[in-house]
Structure formats: structure tokens, C-alpha cells
Amino acid sequence: MDLGLTREQRAVREAFAALFGKQATPQRVRRAESSPSTGFDGLLWRHYAEIGALGIGVPSDCGGADGGLLELALVAEEAGRRLAPIPVAETAAAARLLGRLREKELLGPVLTGSVIVSLATRSGPVSQQMLVDGAIADAVLALDGESVVYVTRPDRLPKTARRNLGGLPLAPWYAPGATTVLAEGGEARTAFDTAVDEVRVLRAALLVGLASAAVGIGSRYAIVREAFGQRIGMYQAVAHPFADAVTALDGAQLLVHKACWAMDSGQDDAAALAAMAFAFAAETSYHATTHSLHVHGGYGFMEEYDIQLYYRRAKAWAAAFADPRRELLTVADRLFGPVTTGGR
């Protein structure tokens, strides 16, 4: 196992760092957050599609670039670093699932960005779920029983998000549109479960990028802010938690990359690693952003300061997928087997 990046992978990371650095400015993030669909920048989405992002993880015979999960994780990390107000994780996993199912006709408009397809990460009818991209998605892939279904958005459903602290286009679909069964049986369920694990890994990558940027914001503030006659970064109570955060984030990033490798190479522990990556990234990003906000003092809670954008999303982006503490039970189940009477 080599977790080092190839030249092509470094180029992917640099390209998307440049895109998000230019197009996902704090001003654009704030503007998207205040829009009715909350957390969606249509112009950024268009540029994201034009650069080929939506086809990175899709097989070449379906019109994609034949990339792996690691390439998508690199994109997600850069998106998280800039709080990019576009759907990254669920849409990427949904596109890969359509590719596995060889749904080339459905994939066409998805790869151009003209149709946004998300993934309902909990099994059951779409009408019973709060969808992370519900305010902007044109269609949703879901698991209903043993069937993978493609559910379209009804025309009468308004594109209005539920208010939330994470700047997410959260919305329920109480009355979904037309439903098409794409696959049925055990293989269909396995394919869908794999897609959900890919969301786990990509959400972890988003959180790693988010927290890395938050640590940078906090440490730069600590260098210039003075108290009691010296810069606060000189105090160990300020500096040491930043060092701990950087170390933990390096570990979280490596765990994300290992999970990507395990899933792409079909390792037996791939599912456990995916859950580990999400749980650890969620915990690490929350602690890192909390310290960065704390260092700002009262200013950290003011909307004029960027750190509050990161602090709010650190918890909300994780919670939108799952409770990180309960995710540890998923890790245990996948490592040791489900809980049974009398223990594991």
C-alpha cells in the first residue's frame, strides 16, 4: 500500500484548489448561505461541471474519466477547505453508482451538470428522509427494500431549504415524483451500500479540508493578536492545541486515503475503514475548529469573522450524514460483528 500521490493526483488537487480558491470566496459562501436554496452557488456549480469534476469517478465507458475514490477525496478536501457551496459528496457517489449500474442515459446530463442527482443515504422511501441536497436535487437515488430506485423531483416541490447552521440545501421530499427501479436484489443492495460508504469517505475528506483551513485561520490570528503584552500564540495553552490539531488532521487525512485505497482495491476491511475515516474526521474537525474559534474570543461568534463559518459547518456537515458517536458503533459492528445477546 502506497498512500503517496501520483503526479496526476497532485495535478487534480492543484486544479481544484485553484478553482475553489477563485470561485468559493468567503463572500460567495455567505451569499449562497443567504439564498432560498441555502448553500448553493449556481455559477460555481457550472464551473465545477465544466472542469470535468462530475465525471472523475465514473467509468470511461460511461463517459467519465475512470478515476478512483482517492481523486474524488482530493477534490472534496479542497472543497471543504474553501467551504465550497455546491454538493460534492452525495453527487459524486450517486454518479459512481449510476456508472456501476451502467445507466448511461441517466448519466449523460449528470456529467454535464444540467441534472443534479443526489443520494438518499438511509434506506427506505425518499418521502421519509431529510435529504442533504433536497432543495437543489433534480433526482435522488435511494434504496427501497432490495431495490435501487431513481426518484425525480416533482414540479410542485419548491426549491427552498430548511434553515440550518451548516449552510446546507437541506429539504424533505414529502411527495416525490416518478420512481424508476434501476436494480433489484442482493447485488443492487451491495452496490448501494458501497455508494453510501463512499459518501462516508468523501464527507470525511470535506471535514479534513474544512478543519485544516480553520486551523490556519486560528493560528494566523494568534500570531497577530496581543494580550498581556505579547502575542497570544506565544502562550502554550494556545499553541499546543494547534499542534495537536495538525497532528490529528494528518492522521485523519491518512485514514481517508487508506479508506479510498481499501475501497478501490476491494480490501476486506474497506467498509470498516470508511466508517473509521468518517468518525475520526468528524471528531477531529470539531475539536480543531472549536479551538480556532475559542482563540478568537468573542470575535469568533461575530458574522464578520470567517472562523464562525467553519465552526458551524464542522458539526453540521457531519451531523447531516450521521451522528459521529453512533458511527463508532458502525465501526465496531464491521470489525467485530453485530451486537448479539450476551455480547459481540
Language-model-derived ranges and their functions:
Residues L83-A89, R96-G216, R220, G342-R344:
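FAD-binding core of flavoproteins
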Residues M1-R82, G185, T194-R344:
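Alpha-helical interface subdomain recognition
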